[in-house]
C-alpha cells in the first residue's frame, strides 16, 4: 500500500511551512533570550495566522473554523514542530474541549475563540498532582454569578 498526501493536504503543508518559516522562526532567538513571547508579537502572530487560515484550523467550519480533520491538523502540527513551542503555541489552535460547547456556549466561548477575540486557557498542573488529572484537588464552585476557585494551579497556559 502506498501512502501519499492529497493535493489539498500538500497545500496545507506548504501554507503552514511558509507561515512557520516567515512568521515564527525569525523570532525564535529573541523569544528564547527573553524567556517569553512579548504581547505585541503574540498579537502579530495571532493576526497573521488568522489571515493565513491556520488559526482555529481544527474547529468546525460551520462556526468559522478551518474544519480540518485530525489527520490534516496533525500535518499543521508537524510543520509547527520546526520552531519553538513558545511561538507555535500561539497558533496551536483553540482547545478541542471547545468542540463540546452547546447552545449559548457556542456564541459565548466557541465563536469568539475561533475568531481570536477570546483566548482559551488550560489550568491543569497542581502542586501535588503535576499534570495527572486524576490527582487534581482544585475545584470551581458557582457562587451566584461568580465562580470560586478552591486550590492552587501552576503553569496556566494562556493565562496572561
Locate each region found by the language model.
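Glycine-rich flavin
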Residues: 25-160
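Intrinsic disorder at enzyme termini
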Residues: 1-12, 140
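A non-catalytic, amphipathic alpha-helix used as a structural packing/dimerization or gating element
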Residues: 8-22
Amino acid at each position: 500500500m502506498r501512502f501519499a498526501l492529497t493535493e489539498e493536504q500538500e497545500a496545507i503543508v506548504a501554507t503552514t511551512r511558509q507561515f512557520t518559516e516567515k512568521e515564527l522562526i525569525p523570532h525564535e532567538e529573541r523569544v528564547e533570550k527573553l524567556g517569553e513571547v512579548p504581547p505585541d508579537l503574540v498579537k502579530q502572530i495571532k493576526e497573521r495566522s488568522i489571515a493565513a487560515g491556520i488559526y482555529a484550523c481544527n474547529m468546525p467550519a460551520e462556526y468559522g473554523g478551518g474544519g480540518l480533520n485530525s489527520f490534516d491538523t496533525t500535518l499543521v502540527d508537524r510543520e509547527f514542530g520546526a520552531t519553538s513551542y513558545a511561538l507555535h503555541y500561539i497558533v496551536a489552535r483553540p482547545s478541542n474541549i471547545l468542540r463540546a460547547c452547546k447552545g449559548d456556549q457556542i456564541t459565548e466561548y466557541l465563536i469568539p475563540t475561533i475568531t481570536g477575540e477570546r483566548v482559551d486557557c488550560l489550568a491543569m498542573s497542581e502542586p501535588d498532582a503535576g499534570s495527572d488529572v486524576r490527582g487534581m484537588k482544585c475545584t470551581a464552585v458557582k457562587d451566584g454569578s461568580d465562580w470560586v476557585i478552591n486550590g492552587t494551579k501552576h503553569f496556566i497556559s494562556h493565562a496572561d
